[in-house]
Every structure is written in C-alpha cells, then in structure tokens.
Amino acid sequence: MKNSNKFTRRNFLATTATAAAGFSIVPSNVIAGLGHKAPSDKLNIAGVGVGGMGRGNLRNMKSENIVALCDVDWAHSDRCFKDFPDAKKFWDWRKMYDEMGKSIDAIMVATADHSHGIVAAHAMTLGKHVYVQKPLTHTVYESRLLTKLADKHKVATSMGNQGSSAEGVRLIQEWLWNDEIGEVTKVEAFTDRPLWPQGLAKPAEGMPVPETMNWDLFIGPAKFRPYHRMYTPWNFRGWWDFGTGALGDMACHILHPVFMGLKLGYPTRVQGSSTDVMTDSAPNTEIVKLVFPARPKAAESKINFPEVEVTWMDGGIQPMKPIGWPEGKSMNDDGGGVIFHGTKDKIICGCYGVRPWLLSGREPKVQKTIPRIKDSHEQDWIRACKESPENRTETASPFSQAGPFNEMVVMGVLAVRLQGLEKELLWDGPKMEFTNIRDREELKFCLDTGLKIVDGHPSFSRKYTDPVSAKEFAADLIKHNYREGWSLPAMP
C-alpha cells in the first residue's frame, strides 16, 4: 500500500489555492460561465467514502461525471472502483482536494461518522457543493459549523436522509399544520436497530492492518487506537469514536418529520437512560427524552406549537400501543416508527416517514401545499448544484435545516453518555453548552462488565475508568479536540 500519510494538513492549506493547474478535467462552472449551469451540463463529482452507502449514492449520481474516488479501504471500495473505472483513485481526501480541487464541482461524503464534518467543511471552503450521508456530523459544533459554512459559501447541500424527499414527510407536515390531530405535546419514536454489535468492551489487543487499508487515515481526527476488524467496515456505527450508535444512525431518518412538522429548534432539557454505558461502545438499548419549548405559530399552520416532549427508543423496545391500536398490527414499519400524540387524534408513520395514517382511521383530505420531489434524493441535490445561489430551490435536506436537525440528533447521544450525572440536563442551544453541570461533578464509565457464570450462577466484576471531569468530558463531546494534524476551518 502506498504511504499517503506524508500529506499533512499544513501541505493541504499551503497548496490548495494553486493546485490542479495541469489537469485536463475542467469544472462545469468554468464552462457554463457565472455559476449557473444548464441542466444538460454535467457536474464533476468526487466521492469520499465509497465502499458502503457512498457507492449507492454515486450510482444514483451516474448521470454526472464521477471524476475521483477516495477511500481508506481499497478492498471494501473495489466494487465502486469498478463501477467508475475512469475516476482517479485516492487514499487521502486532502491530497485529492490538493491535486484536483479546481477540477471538481461537488463532493459526496460517506465516510465513517467522525470524518463527515471535517471532509465536508473543507470542501465548502473550496466552494464545492456537498452531499453528506447521515448523520450529518459527529458533534453539535460540527453541525453548527457546516450550517454556517453552507450559508457563507452559498453552495448546494444535502444530508443523505433520503426520506426527506419522499411523500410521507410532506403529508405529515400538511396534516399537522391543517389541524388534523390538534396540538402536539408528546412524540414517541423508535428504531429496531442496532443491527451491528454494540455494548462491547474495547478489544484488548490490535490486529495487523490489511495491506488494502490505510488505518491512520481511517482514524483521521479521532484519537489513535490499534486496528481491529471489529471497527470497520459497517461496525464503526457502534463505536463512540467513529459512530453515533443506533440513535445517530437512524434518528436522522425517523425524527425528520418530527423536526419539520413541529418546527423544532434547540431542545432545552434532555435526559438519557440505557443499558451499560461503556467507555468505547454505544449501549445495546437506550431511551432519550428531549424537551422543546413552545415555538411561534407559523403562517402556514392552523395550530400552535406548545412545549413538546420527544422520546426516542432503540435496541428492540417500542412505545406502548395507544388505546384504539388495531389488534395484531405491528408498529415497526420499515425499521422503526413514530407516534404524534395530538389533542384530537394521533399520526403514526414508519421509518423515513413512510405510510402515515391516523389512529382514528379517518383519511385526511388536505390540500398539497409543499412542493414534491420528482426525482431521487441525489438527483434533486444535483439539480440544486446546477442552479445559481440567487435562483436556487433548496434541496429537501439542506444544511440550513439538516444542521440544526442533526444537532438535535447528536444531543440524544450526549444525553446517553452523560446519564451518570443522574439528572435532567439543561441545554443552552445558542451557546452550545449545558448550564447545570458543575465544576466538581465527575463521571466514570464501564470498561468491562466482567460477567462470569460459575456452576450456573452469574457474577459481575465490572471495571470502570478513573473519574473524569463531567464538564470537560461534556465539552469534548460538544466540540472534539482533534488529533494533531487535523483541524476544522474557523467558524464563520
């Protein structure tokens, strides 16, 4: 494997402005003139993280020129490389930006969660349109940063929560705003995930790094640890340093109609509860409560938006079925579900907002007021990329909306990881800080449950970390201290 680690952050910043002068690929904005592109013009798109979801995203973008592919695991990415044999291959996205930055119009990001923010942020500072898989970022701060960078650089953006482009989310919003179920003060949501391992202790020993992988680049901004096949591919979702557990993986799909339909902003109170809170791995099962204050009544809505409590569940548990639930009907629809508890009725939908229905059995007759997406989620982003900022119709999940929404999602992760404080946490959204964690408070986390069964009798010998400052730990969860050599652009 070629060693690409010599390409440093310093090299990237020093050379980006003058890179790629010798390449023959010309970005379509140069051909098209002042930023607006005819629909027939093709974008030059690069993919970062192309072995899993990224491959599917790029296949839905094959109407355009896929000019570069970047991944840290070339064995896992081989199928995508074969899909686009003319695309130049890279290990390091920084080197790709350096060498081909001026030749690329747009970036698709589908790395492990912990790298979403840094890859997308630097792409936008270069003026690139970005499509980022869910969850949008690993932290609250990264979400806020991407929101502001998108606004500053006027690029087309989309998070990869494809249900936001579908019919169900729009119907739910229209039903809510038309007063079909009354005011909503309670929402319950769940997923049947995780499908990957969680609740694990960190492997005691590392393994040799495969020749087809650059492990240092996979680690990226996270704290370094030895390679183990338990971490990637796919399983990164269950490890805190790389993923956000079942909540982060699925709430961007399942809670989207909640965020949009109830016009949510920052939560002000949060709590989490789960099975063992391990140091390195997300729990097998968790419950999170987020409380949002009353919001102003919107012009398009007949209802008020009072304080609302949103409860999330995962790991196999579901809300209790309300009175009137059809006997024998599963609540799990396509991997999860939501119940909007209104003062007059209830809306139930599946994951991605699919197949909404009213508990009463009534079928709402509501005028369609929200524009519908006629093409795929990815193609709608491509459409937005080709429109000038002044005349652009936003995508179904632009960062102006996906950024604040993702802050809500990863706030649930914070609630779970801080549950050892044994209290409801108070959140100041604009300042991105908890207001009721005191300087002297400490936390400790389980390293190993030490479960043993001897003669049919179970025993536990749990091992814990040394106590850490709760305030410092929370601050790092909100805004990570990146590994040396890795950094984000400044907050606008």
Please tell me what each predicted stretch does:
Residues 36, 56-58, 62, 70, ...:
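Glycine-enriched catalytic-core subsegment of oxygenase/oxidase enzymes
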Residues 16-84, 163-166, 258:
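N-terminal Rossmann-like dinucleotide-binding module
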Residues 107-108:
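N-terminal Rossmann-like NAD(P) cofactor-binding module of classical short-chain dehydrogenase/reductase
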Residues 32, 49, 53, 57, ...:
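Predominantly a Rossmann-like dinucleotide-binding segment in NAD(P)-dependent oxidoreductases
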